[in-house]
Regions:
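A short loop-to-beta-strand scaffold at the N-terminal edge of the catalytic core in hydrolase folds
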Residues: 1-11
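Gly/Ala-rich beta-loop-alpha elbow adjacent to hydrolase catalytic centers
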Residues: 95-104, 122
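Short, surface-exposed "cap/lid" segments of acyl-processing enzymes
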Residues: 11-54
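Alpha/beta-hydrolase active-site loop signature
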Residues: 26, 55-60, 125
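Catalytic nucleophile-loop/oxyanion-hole region of alpha/beta-hydrolase
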Residues: 58-88
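The alpha/beta-hydrolase serine catalytic core
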Residues: 114-192
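Active-site signature of alpha/beta-hydrolase-fold catalytic machinery across serine-
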Residues: 106-110
Length: 192
């Protein structure tokens, strides 16, 4: 399977629960990494063990982002939660930020694993709109360079044809962008 990295923050005593952090996408994670680590330390000091996931193809995990998919990332969450359930019998909480919050919500709606709570920070609410925002970053960065301007529609076509594109220093593939685009709150009414 895909190898991925986790960082764990343990409690000095038996934890009240174990919180698993589901990260945001791309530069959003890099910009908030210190904040997330500090919050995880605070959770641990308050009696809540915490694990931060670097999804396959991101951070310190193996693989390339262009080869990632939502299915792979959900397997990363599943394996992490399954391992924690085997190791300790405490409630499990998914904590997600931005895209990670939406992925956590989607995972909780579809998973057979017992997830006791969700902690969602600034969740995106529409995958298609979020992908458009990501692709606009590419359009904006290319606008200052010579050559014909590229539109989000053209980028979507390239991704759909299996090409990878670079956005803000990250090479992304069509499968992941299609997966993110398909996320919709309308499909998650089972949690309401």
């Amino acid at each position: 399977g895909e190898r991925y990295f986790t960082l764990q923050f343990s409690c000095p005593q038996q934890p009240k629960a174990h919180i698993v952090f589901v990260p945001p996408f791309g530069e959003e994670m890099n910009r908030c990494r210190a904040l997330v680590s500090e919050q995880a330390r605070r959770f641990a000091r308050s009696g809540y063990a915490c694990t931060i996931i670097d999804f396959y193809g991101t951070g310190d995990s193996q693989g390339e982002l262009r080869d990632a998919s939502l299915q792979i990332w959900q397997r990363n969450i599943h394996l992490t939660l399954e391992t924690l359930q085997r190791e300790m019998s405490v409630p499990l909480i998914l904590w997600g930020l931005r895209l990670g919050a939406f992925i956590a919500l989607d995972f909780a709606a579809k998973s057979a694993l017992a997830i006791d709570s969700l902690l969602l920070w600034q969740p995106i609410i529409a995958g298609e709109r979020y992908v458009t925002q990501i692709l606009r970053q590419r359009v904006a960065s290319l606008a200052s360079k010579e050559g014909a301007p590229e539109t989000t529609t053209e980028i979507r076509k390239r991704l759909a044809q299996g090409e990878s594109v670079e956005v803000s220093g990250y090479t992304i593939g069509g499968a992941l962008m299609a997966d993110i685009e398909s996320l919709s709150l309308a499909h998650l009414t089972a949690l309401c």
